[in-house]
Amino acid sequence: MTDTSRRRGGRAVAVAVLAAVTAVVLGVLWLAQGRQQAVPPADFGAVPPAAVSDTGRPSGAAPPPSVAEGAAVRQAPPERVLVPAVGLDAQVEGVGVTQRGDMTVPDDPAVAGWYRYGPEPGSAEGSAVLVGHLDSDTGDLGEFAALRDVRPGDTVEVRRAGAEPVVHRVTARATVPKDELPPSAFRRSGPPVLTLITCAPPFEPERGGYTANLVVTAEPVDARQGP
C-alpha cells in the first residue's frame, strides 16, 4: 500500500468517525428538545382538587348512592365530549361507584366516564364530572391525556342524548396530589361547572402508579342553558 492510499484511508476513517459523532450529538439535542416540548404548560385558574387513584378512579369520590339517587331519571345524559383545540374526542358512558365508594372508570382509555349520580353536563347547578384514563396498561395515551394542553378559553362541547350540545369554556387547570379531595369537586348544588379529571405524573410504581391528578374546570358559555 502506498503512502497516498494510507492517507486516503485515514481521511475516510476520520470522516466516518466525525459523521458518527455528529449524528450522536444531533440525536441528543433532538431528544432534549422533545423532552422540553413534553413539559406540560403551567397550571392556571383556581380549581377544586379531586383525587384519582392509581386505577384511574377518583378516590373517595362519593359514598354509594341511595336507591332514590340511583333511580333518578336523566333527561339528557352525555354521549360524547370534545375539546377541539387539543384534539380530544371521547365517547362518554355513565358510571357509578364501587363498594369502596370509588368512582369507576371505563377500561378503554378512549372512553370517558360520567358520574351518573351527580349533575349532568348542562344542568342548572352543580359539578358535572367526567373522568378518563391518562393511558392504558400498554402505555398508549388515552383521550384525556390531551387535557394537559388546554388553555384558558378553550371550548369543551358535550353532546347529549335527546338534547342540544352544551358548550363550556375552560377556566382552570390544576395538578394536585391525588389524596386531596374536597367535596366541592362532586357537589350537586352551586354554580354549574364541568369538571374533567385524569391522572398526572409523577408515576411511582412503588406507590401504585400516578401520584397526582390533572383537574380541568370549565364553565358553561350560557349559564342559563339546561337539559
Feature locations, PLM:
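N-terminal export and membrane-targeting signals
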Residues: 1-22
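Short, charged beta-turn/beta-strand-edge "cap" motif at the junction between a beta-strand
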Residues: 161-165
